[in-house]
């Protein structure tokens, strides 16, 4: 029988992708060279510096997700005008400081107040060799946020600790925004550290950032979780920021119009939208359900019944996860409105691909626009949700 410490370690390795599963084999060194390396450097991690996560983070975040605790969010907006060259950095600092109205805080704890001090900071960056109109990305813009009613001071303290640990050898500034429902902080991090190594965060690095951010939040008394969508049986991505902001202003993005047209065509032809990633999702679901079963069984054996029950609850949540695409959900909503029948979630089987046809009623444009399509095929310049 595994010891509790061994189970924690194996769960940590699995949730981060180091091993194929609890008690599974290692993925090998090539995996970590691909997912954690500074560009042009043989050492360090692509996601910056920072110490190791606390042992047991895997189980802690899974049980937190089972309790429905809020998920931490980290986003990296992809805007060349806010990151390329000194001009891009200046644009971003103007934006996050609200043109100098909000104080920035640097990696040494110094406050940078007003446009004049921001300009002094930019002069320092220029002396580091950052060109005004460089085509290269010279700063990484990171947004860390939490749900409404999160204590803003504790959030800010957690972000500060996260930045100090994750970007230990980089110059950075941070600022908090409280003008939206979701309190959030902006980080502007220089890509090169003091040794000349360049940040090159990969997907697994970004997830590790979320885990570290959650760790810092808990240290400051904010209960939260950091899991992937698949860990919770969630398969639809959140609406991208740019289309959401356009919609909130009463406009329609090209993403919305494109998918409204695709929905109209599907409704007119009575053709249920396909799910191109269904087989991949089913395979992922099977792996996660299997791992949750192993973890729950080991916890029961070790006498941790409460934690085992939480993992079992999470397992059922994944088993019952709705694998429909955003387009399929919109199609079902439109049919419900046309036929006056309740929308039903499709089970996790091939039935999603071969839904039986019903009497087609020609839809109106209003029907399509009421569906709230938010799926985007092309995420370029829309930012990354992790």
Predicted regions, residues:
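N-terminal nicking endonuclease/strand-transfer module with a His-rich metal-binding environment
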Residues: 1-386
């Amino acid at each position: 029988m595994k010891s509790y410490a061994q189970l924690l370690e194996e769960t940590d390795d699995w949730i981060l992708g180091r091993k194929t599963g609890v008690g599974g084999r290692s993925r090998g060194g090539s995996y970590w060279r691909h997912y954690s390396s500074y560009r042009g450097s043989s050492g360090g991690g692509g996601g910056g510096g920072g110490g190791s996560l606390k042992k047991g983070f895997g189980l802690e975040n899974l049980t937190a997700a089972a309790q429905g605790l809020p998920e931490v969010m980290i986003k990296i907006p992809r805007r060349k005008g806010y990151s390329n060259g000194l001009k891009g950095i200046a644009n971003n600092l103007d934006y996050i400081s609200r043109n100098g109205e909000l104080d920035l805080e640097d990696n040494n704890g110094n406050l940078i107040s007003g446009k004049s001090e921001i300009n002094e900071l930019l002069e320092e960056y220029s002396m580091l060799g950052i060109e005004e109109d460089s085509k290269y990305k010279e700063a990484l813009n990171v947004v860390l946020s939490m749900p409404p009613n999160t204590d803003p001071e504790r959030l800010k303290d957690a972000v500060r600790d996260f930045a100090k640990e994750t970007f230990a050898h980089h110059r950075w500034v941070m600022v908090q925004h409280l003008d939206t429902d979701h309190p959030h902080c902006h980080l502007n991090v220089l890509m090169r550290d003091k040794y000349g190594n360049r940040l090159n965060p990969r997907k697994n690095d970004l997830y590790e950032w979320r885990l570290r951010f959650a760790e810092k939040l808990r240290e400051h008394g904010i209960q939260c979780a950091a899991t992937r969508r698949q860990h919770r049986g969630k398969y639809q991505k959140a609406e991208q920021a740019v289309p959401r902001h356009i919609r909130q202003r009463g406009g329609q993005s090209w993403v919305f119009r494109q998918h409204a047209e695709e929905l109209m065509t599907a409704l007119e032809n009575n053709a249920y939208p396909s799910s191109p990633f269904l087989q991949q999702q089913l395979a992922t679901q099977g792996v996660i359900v299997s791992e949750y079963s192993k973890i729950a069984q080991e916890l029961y054996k070790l006498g941790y019944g409460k934690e085992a029950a939480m993992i079992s609850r999470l397992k059922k949540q994944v088993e019952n996860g709705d694998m429909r695409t955003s387009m399929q959900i919109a199609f079902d909503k439109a049919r419900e409105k046309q036929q006056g029948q309740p929308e039903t979630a499709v089970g996790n089987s091939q039935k999603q691909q071969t839904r039986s046809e019903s009497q087609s009623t020609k839809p109106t444009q209003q029907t399509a626009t009421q569906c709230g399509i938010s799926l985007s095929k092309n995420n370029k310049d829309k930012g990354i949700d992790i």
